């Protein structure tokens, strides 16, 4: 079944053009089932592009999903029209009374700052605590993953001498994991970050299990059973051109940047990159949503009971 999103959301037409099944709010009402309620806390500067990336993966599920777009209340977005935010987004304060089957927390362009120096860190801490009582399962991505694993387990992030940037081979460390069902033994994942979390720090926490890792880029995906959380430190959701967009943006701004590793054909930035991670991105999100469906409560009000802070 398709993803349910507002009829006038810019992502609607983009997804239809790609062949992703989407459903109007009017049509969804006629289906006598409870759709999965998934929220996207979008911390990225270009919110519209990020909406499309995650809605594409969610919409490929055979289950009906209702997507709620959420933003930080006290933070002024610089790269997304205010009209778009007012039309399609709610602040966390406006949705915190609700319960959700799933929550995705995106990356944010603040990864070189200490967490405590991020202007909205206090609200992020409240959101993380809120997920324990109001969200069945959370997918934390890039900075969102680093922030969450630091908040819950004090696992630190470490700065890198140069940006981890490109497409890298990763290993499947847990073939029997429900989240890696159908995964190859090795696969490609886009990476774009200035910081990392380290295996040695994660291994100090008994509840954390490393599912995906790269010899060059280190830890990629961590599962925490106790809190129903996944920590994805890289960007499986990226479009084919996302790394190119970042590269040319930095080049235009005069920021020193290397070509993204193993990305442009023949390392020629005039050639169109091939997407070699799309199928595994769909597998990961499909498995996450399937597990969500299998384990969540039919009554949304029961989500989080007995899990508390």
UniProtKB/Swiss-Prot annotation:
GO molecular function annotations of the record: homoserine O-acetyltransferase activity; homoserine O-succinyltransferase activity
BP terms from Gene Ontology: L-methionine biosynthetic process from homoserine via O-succinyl-L-homoserine and cystathionine
Residues reported in the UniProt entry to bind substrate: 163, 192, 249
Keywords for the protein's UniProt record, in alphabetical order: Acyltransferase, Amino-acid biosynthesis, Cytoplasm, Methionine biosynthesis, Transferase
EC number: 2.3.1.31
Superkingdom field: Bacteria
InterPro entries attached to this UniProt entry: Class_I_gatase-like, HST_MetA, MetA_family
Entry annotation: catalytic residues: 142, 235, 237
HAMAP family, per database record: MetA_acyltransf (MF_00295)
Record-stated family: Belongs to the MetA family.
PANTHER family given in the database record: HOMOSERINE O-SUCCINYLTRANSFERASE
Name this protein carries in UniProt: Homoserine O-acetyltransferase
Protein encoded by which gene: metAA
